[in-house]
Amino acid sequence: MLSSMARIAIIGGGSIGEALLSGLLRAGRQVKDLVVAERMPDRARYLADTYSVLVTSVTDAVENAMFVVVAVKPTDVESVMGDLVQAAAVANDSAEQVLVTVAAGVTITYLESKLPAGTPVVRAMPNAAALVGAGVTVLAKGRFVTGQQFEDVLAMFDAVGGVLTVPESQMDAVTAVSGSGPAYFFLLVEALVDAGVAVGLTRQVATELAAQTMAGSAAMLLERMDQDRHSAEVAPLGAQVDVPAAQLRATITSPGGTTAAALRELERGGLRMVVDAAVQAAKIRSEQLRITSE
């Protein structure tokens, strides 16, 4: 559990920064232990008025913070590094302050090369669903991060949804599946709504049906995954584990029925190949945007 005394500085009050701020407050974090750095005056006023949080400069926000979350766009990271380095220089022990980056493509080695030696760095990739507390954040830790520090960061992001950990080498793949993933689902909903209108539904009804169907299907899948995890704990070593999505699809598909007819058309249209190509393209683009150490 994240210490109630740990001060958290959020650098950047955009959508992800606000999602983390609101999530931490919902989880019971005291507003006095949170501070935000935001350069846009209108945005700063909005955050201060909405959450009663202190909004200040980067240098002031970082001072005395145990965790510094860099939630700016990748193109803005370089501009805040000077302030972060300056603040770290006056700190008593840089190893006590953990820097967490949620900026896409900004690598741990890049940040370690800019900050004082031994600074703990964690890379995080949340997705857009964090805005409603239902996201998933994937974390990768740097070489100077202690076990307790990493547990604290896990607890921090648990306030905005699920949390997974991977080696940093997999973060581009994570970006392609999860970071960009919500847009894939929105596009699928768009297509499903348009198809619903084409067969006689109103757009409002089709949208409600599509959205609720997506939400319910996701809930079914998550429940099955929990059941499978429990089964795996008692299963013999090496036992085959089925893909839960495939299990559920088979369960609700009656031979010769309407669902089978629809799935046949999706397979004939190359849905799997298109999804694979999309994820590959996103991964390649993430690699191209990567910011590494000089």
Swiss-Prot record:
GO cellular component, one term: cytoplasm
PROSITE patterns xrefs: P5CR
Gene3D superfamilies assigned: NAD(P)-binding Rossmann-like Domain, ProC C-terminal domain-like
Pathway(s) where this gene product acts: Amino-acid biosynthesis; L-proline biosynthesis; L-proline from L-glutamate 5-semialdehyde: step 1/1
GO biological process terms on file: L-proline biosynthetic process
Family matches, as InterPro entries: 6-PGluconate_DH-like_C_sf (IPR008927), NAD(P)-bd_dom_sf (IPR036291), P5C_Rdtase_cat_N (IPR028939), P5CR-like_CS (IPR053790), P5CR_dimer (IPR029036), Pyrroline-COOH_reductase (IPR000304)
GO terms of molecular function: pyrroline-5-carboxylate reductase activity
Disulfide bonds: none
Keyword Transmembrane: no
Uppermost EC category: oxidoreductase
UniProt superkingdom: Bacteria
Primary localisation category: cytoplasm
Pfam families in alphabetical order: F420_oxidored, P5CR_dimer
Enzyme Commission number(s): 1.5.1.2
Subcellular locations according to the entry: Cytoplasm
Catalytic activity: L-proline + NADP(+) = (S)-1-pyrroline-5-carboxylate + NADPH + 2 H(+); L-proline + NAD(+) = (S)-1-pyrroline-5-carboxylate + NADH + 2 H(+)
Keyword annotations: Amino-acid biosynthesis, Cytoplasm, NADP, Oxidoreductase, Proline biosynthesis
Function comment: Catalyzes the reduction of 1-pyrroline-5-carboxylate (PCA) to L-proline.
Family membership noted in the UniProt record: Belongs to the pyrroline-5-carboxylate reductase family.
Family annotation (NCBIfam families): proC
PANTHER family hit by this protein: PYRROLINE-5-CARBOXYLATE REDUCTASE, PYRROLINE-5-CARBOXYLATE REDUCTASE 3
Name of the featured protein: Pyrroline-5-carboxylate reductase
Organism: Mycobacterium leprae (strain TN)
